[in-house]
Amino acid sequence: MLMQHTLTQLKALKLDGMARAFEEQSTLTASTSLSFEERVGMLVDRELAWRDTRRLERLLRAAKLKNPQACVEDIEYRQTRGLDQRIVATLAGCDWVRNAQNLILTGPTGAGKTWLACAFGQQACRQGFSVFYVRVARLFEELKIAHGDGSFTRRLAQLAKIDVLILDDWGLQDLDQAARNDLLEVLDDRVGTRSTVITSQLPLEHWHAWLQDPTLADAILDRLVHQAHKLPVKGDSMRKKTKSESADA
């Protein structure tokens, strides 16, 4: 009776991890040999682990990663990809996020840029940072709608609070003047305070021409490329490789 009352109180306090551990202890005879301090310590440890797990789940749901299973441990380092394992390991530490620096992934279509961006995004979530993935074209569609319904300022504020904003397929489609202005607004709110990840088939040296407006291009690239980590990805299409391996299996 007392045990059930304690469980009910723990759940009422939203100490779900501790409640589960307490219930487990009551069914294990080995727990009786532990001291009071040891048992309490185990309960607290379980609660902390439970909260960490729930927080990670919330962050990953909010991130909306295109490849939610991508993780840095599964990155392939074939020589043809040109990835430096030491650089990747450094990026996996997420100091670039803590220092509000950006990450630019460039390479041919299918080379795995989006997957890598999602892997770094998941790693950032693991370390407690908020992440959001969006394709560039989709972002500007949403911002155009936000202008129309009066939610643009609120949406900008939301984007400004995200620790790691992943902009996928940069340079794939031309931007109109309104989109270029919106892009500057988004990046200006983030410079020096938050990190932005870019994936692009377009080589970095072509970005200025893609943005068309020289003045805006200078302002946008200054905010984005300054102190950015650049990770070029080489090699054949990873999508074709995966299909080929599936066919051979």
Swiss-Prot record:
One of its GO terms (molecular function) is ATP binding. Pfam families: IstB_IS21 (PF01695). GO terms for biological process: DNA replication. Transmembrane segments: none annotated. ATP binds at L105, T106, G107, P108, T109, G110, A111, G112. InterPro entries: AAA+_ATPase, DNAC/IstB-like, IstB, IstB_ATP-bd, P-loop_NTPase. Keywords: ATP-binding, Nucleotide-binding, Plasmid, Transposable element. PANTHER family: ATP-BINDING PROTEIN RV3427C IN INSERTION SEQUENCE-RELATED, CHROMOSOMAL REPLICATION INITIATOR PROTEIN DNAA. Belongs to the IS21/IS1162 putative ATP-binding protein family. This is Insertion sequence IS408 putative ATP-binding protein. It comes from Burkholderia multivorans (strain ATCC 17616 / 249). The lineage of its organism: Bacteria, Pseudomonadati, Pseudomonadota, Betaproteobacteria, Burkholderiales.
